[in-house]
Each structure stands twice: as C-alpha cells, then as structure tokens.
C-alpha cells in the first residue's frame, strides 16, 4: 500500500486516504480525492490529478537530475537593501569552502550545520566540516548562526539535542540564531505527533538554548513555515 501523509493540529494519528483508482506502474492521468479525517470527525478533502509518467532513461550510470546553481550577484541585487543581511547556509555537502571568496562575493553571514540526528531515536553526528567551517567563517569576519538537522519526536529528545548543540558551539562567537531544522515529514506519520506536539518539541529546543543566552529560530522553506509552525 502506498504511504499517504497528513497531519492534524491536535490528532497525532489522523486518517489519510485517497479515493479513486490509480496505478503507479501505468502511465496516465488519474482523477482522485485526498481525504483526511481526525478523531473528532473533522474532515477535509481535496480533488487532485495524479500524473504518472514514463521513467526517464539514464545512460552511463549517471543521474538524470541536472545540477543547478544560483548566481549570488542576482541574489544580492534582488534582496540586499539597508534592512537586510544576505548570506548562505553550509554543511558537508558543500565540501571545502574558501570563506575569503564568500566574503568577497558580498555574503554577510553564514548559517553552519553543526550536525544531524541519524533518524528517529538515532545518535547525534557532528558535521565533518563544522569545525573547519566555523573557524574560517569567523576568521573572515562573517556573522555566524547554527542549525541542527533534527528527527526529535518528543520534548525530552529536543532538550537533549539542544544540550548537545550547546556543547559543540559554546567556545565560538555565535551572533546569529541557533536553528531547529526539522524536515523529515516523510516520516511524520510514524512519529505519532500532532502539529501542536511538533511545535512543543521545537519550543523545548528553543527554551533550552535561550536559557544559555542564544537566540533561536526555525530553519525551513516558506511553505512549511506558513503551514506547519505556529
């Protein structure tokens, strides 16, 4: 059975169904209805069309996905003004970064991944580039913030994560917020969390850091920030 994802403000296990027939192995367009219902009987439904395409062929063992990039000068032109700061976020996925060039390009800050959790209930792993990134960012006079990629599914876990983050960053000059990065919505239904519960998890992470003098924030796309977080 295909996994169907949904979330409710207070029900940690809402019913999520797709009404209509479809076949993911057969190319075509399928008119379907997505239905979500909570334990109080509140129901929402949305009509949508599922498009199933032929898979793209890939030759030579490579990837069919094209690598895209953004012109930083274009970002500055669009977003930089007297009321804004423009910067980047970095992790091991960017490899070894020349932060002098980052500074020269016009970046004013860097949000650095300190680490991540290995799935729900998993260990905390320091980003292998964290120490290099933060040392060189600070040496190049860039403002620094932090983020941790979390799978926290309860307040106790969130507190432990915040304490772990504090241990990693306490010896550095962190002048921007420490962010809670929760992106694992593909696993959300298995966590037995409501959106209210998830917000309480984030608040626990924040309050633990704020008690030590750090500013905090959420890390996420505009869509999730508007839809998920209160």
Spans of features found by a protein language model:
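Aromatic-lined carbohydrate-recognition surfaces of secreted/lumenal glycan-active proteins
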Residues: 209-227
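Extracellular interdomain linker/stem segments of modular secreted and single-pass surface proteins
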Residues: 51-61
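Functionally critical loop-and-helix segments that line ligand-binding/catalytic clefts
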Residues: 60-92
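Solvent-exposed, low-complexity, repeat-rich "mucin-like" stalks and linkers
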Residues: 1-12, 57
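Serine/threonine-rich, repeat-prone extracellular segments and beta-strand-based repeat modules
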Residues: 10-52
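Glycine-rich, charge-decorated loop segments at or immediately adjacent to ligand/cofactor-binding or catalytic sites
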Residues: 157-160, 224-230
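Substrate-binding cleft of extracellular glycoside hydrolase catalytic domains
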Residues: 80-206, 210-212
């Amino acid at each position: 059975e295909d996994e169907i994802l949904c979330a409710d403000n207070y029900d940690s296990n809402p019913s999520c169904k797709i009404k209509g027939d479809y076949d993911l192995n057969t190319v075509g367009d399928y008119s379907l209805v997505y239905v979500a219902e909570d334990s109080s009987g509140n129901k929402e439904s949305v009509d949508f069309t599922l498009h199933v395409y032929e898979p793209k062929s890939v030759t030579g063992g490579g990837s069919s996905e094209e690598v895209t990039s953004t012109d930083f000068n274009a970002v500055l032109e669009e977003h930089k003004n007297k009321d804004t700061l423009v910067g980047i976020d970095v992790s091991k996925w960017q490899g070894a970064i020349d932060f002098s060039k980052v500074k020269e390009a016009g970046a004013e800050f860097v949000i650095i991944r300190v680490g991540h959790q290995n799935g729900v209930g998993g260990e905390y792993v320091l980003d292998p580039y964290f120490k290099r990134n933060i040392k060189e960012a600070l040496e190049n006079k860039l403002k620094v913030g932090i983020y941790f990629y979390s799978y926290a599914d309860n307040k106790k876990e969130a507190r432990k994560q915040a304490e772990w983050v504090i241990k990693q960053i306490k010896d550095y000059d962190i002048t921007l917020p420490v962010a809670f990065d929760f992106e694992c919505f593909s696993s959300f239904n298995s966590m037995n969390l409501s959106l209210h519960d998830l917000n309480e998890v984030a608040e626990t992470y924040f309050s633990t850091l704020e008690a030590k003098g750090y500013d905090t924030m959420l890390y996420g796309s505009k869509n999730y920030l508007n839809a998920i977080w209160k």
